[in-house]
Design a protein with these regions (language model features):
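Alpha-solenoid helical repeat scaffolds
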Residues: 201, 231-241, 270-278, 300, ...
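Short coil/linker segments at helix-helix boundaries
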Residues: 21-48, 58, 69-126, 133-175, ...
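Bacterial N-terminal signal peptides
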Residues: 5-16
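Flexible, glycine-rich surface segments
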Residues: 216-274
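Solenoid-like repeat scaffolds
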Residues: 54-55, 202-207, 221-224, 253-261, ...
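Terminal, low-structured helical/coil segments at or just beyond the last alpha-helical repeat
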Residues: 222, 226-228, 250, 300-327
Length: 327
């Protein structure tokens, strides 16, 4: 009897150890992939995410990361982002030039992530990780529909589903702060709507608050795990919308320091500082330090030989815009 118990204990220990090893490898690949992604190295990012898919084909994490990388790359390469960076204008102006092959690839990975998450939830409706990835996949689906395809009703439906699933996550695991990202963003968006539109969506059971939305995103930015930097990227622009220019600049500085190969974060610092300088001048406050920082950023980027020609042209465009605003 003791022999059987020892064998069973050994099998259990082996299975547990293997599962822990696999999760550790998945976490490492995910971290490496996101570091590459935020440094605009899409090839390396997708290489790591593909390895996640191969290592754990039944786990929705890999497909969801693949979909996220395609979404961010599409936004970075779109003409809206080239003119407004990560601003909310990228979600409200003209139509993006969508790469059909990339769009099909995006849908494939979103579909796969949702299917895998739903399969796990059929076995265990309280599987927190599966609920999170289902909501995260719906969240990136909403972002693609709004930011890339301009299909706002589709975005609203997917976004609402994402929020519902992430609320379920927080009921089961209150400290799962990554799940607050979609909820916080939806709160801010709905809270920012004109009153008639806000009243309309309220009839659908959707309500929001800018203040509450910002608080949730700030919590993700400080206490989240995988969604921490996504929250920071969002907060840069939301702070600018709130005219909190110094907060926006500092958040962008932190991102630029962490991801030095991402020139967009450096341009975000300059953009926030330019707006801050305009406001300070109106208040007749000193602006010398901020002006110097803006000049240093553009000087550094203009001499950066790692940037390609289109990026250099973008830097020149942003510099000309900044100079006009600061005259």
């Amino acid at each position: 009897m003791r022999v059987i118990a020892s064998i069973l204990l050994g099998i259990f220990w082996t299975i547990t150890t293997l599962a822990q090893d696999q999760q550790a490898r998945l976490d490492t690949l995910r971290a490496e992939g996101y570091e590459a992604l935020y440094n605009l190295d899409y090839g390396t990012a997708r290489n790591r995410f593909q390895k996640m898919v191969e290592l754990a084909p039944d786990n929705p994490a890999g497909p969801q990361c693949m979909a996220s990388s395609l979404w961010l790359q599409q936004l970075n390469q779109s003409w809206q982002l080239k003119s407004t960076l990560y601003s909310t204008g990228a979600y409200t102006e003209g139509k993006a030039q969508v790469d059909r092959k990339q769009a099909d690839e995006f849908r494939k990975w979103v579909r796969r992530a949702k299917q895998l998450a739903q399969a796990r939830l059929r076995k265990d409706p309280h599987d927190v990780e599966a609920l999170y990835f289902l909501g995260a996949s719906e969240g990136v689906e909403a972002s693609w529909a709004a930011g890339v395809e301009r299909k706002f009703m589709a975005a609203f439906r997917a976004g609402t589903d994402s929020v519902d699933h992430h609320r379920e996550v927080l009921k089961l695991a209150p400290n799962f702060h990554d799940a607050e990202l979609t909820i916080g963003l939806m709160n801010y968006i709905v809270g920012s709507l004109p009153l008639p539109t806000k009243m309309l969506v309220a009839t659908m059971g959707v309500r929001g608050s800018r203040k509450r939305g910002l608080e949730m995103l700030e919590r993700v930015a400080t206490e989240g795990k995988w969604a921490r930097d996504v929250a920071r990227v969002l907060l840069v622009d939301l702070y600018k919308r709130e005219k909190r220019f110094e907060d926006a600049a500092q958040m962008a500085r932190d991102l630029a320091a962490k991801y030095p190969r991402n020139y967009l974060f450096k341009l975000q610092v300059a953009d926030a500082l330019t707006s801050q300088i305009v406001a300070l001048r109106k208040a007749k406050k000193p602006v010398i330090a901020a002006e110097k920082e803006v000049q240093d950023i553009f000087a550094s980027l203009s001499h950066d030989k790692t940037l390609d020609t289109p990026t250099r042209e973008l830097v020149n465009v942003r510099w000309n815009i900044a100079r006009k605003e600061l005259q």
